[in-house]
Amino acid sequence: MTVRRAEEKDIPKILDLLVQVDMVHHNARPDIFKGPATKYNADELRVILKNEETPVFVCTDDNSIPLGHAFCIHKQITYNSVLTDIRTLYIDDICVDDSARGKHIGKKLFNYVKAYAKSMGVYNITLNVWSCNETAMKFYEAMGLLPQKTGMELIL
């Protein structure tokens, strides 16, 4: 298995992975997530893949077929009256194909993202995770992430 930057040829598989992510959330919260859907279409992915501020990494099998992806976004807080000036690498989306789970692909992807973030000199890695996605929460905790803030809701 190899981790590399995603390329245009990976878009069909990335779209499939995005549907898998959506369905995890839809199955847990059908009141919020439509399912089956993707957060980006192929044209949007082409733009994202070309942008150095939004690197996407894939972990591929021996045939260069993506088994998982990690969408990242470089963020920087500057000139804020309350917050310090820091650079953050935000993980917008991370997924391992249903058929490839249990093979440590998620760990390999996360460790690659972590090494990339260090090489870019960012202060931290951040992400959001839905509380209904307990598997993801456990994975992120195992990777060393700690809660930074909590979003809450009251359904009326």
What are these regions (language model features)?
Residues 5, 122, 141-150:
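Conserved acetyl-CoA-binding loop of GNAT-fold acetyltransferases
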Residues 43-58:
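A short helix-loop-beta-strand connector motif used in the catalytic cores of GNAT acetyltransferases and
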Residues 65, 93, 97-111, 118-120, ...:
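Conserved glycine-rich acetyl-CoA-binding loop
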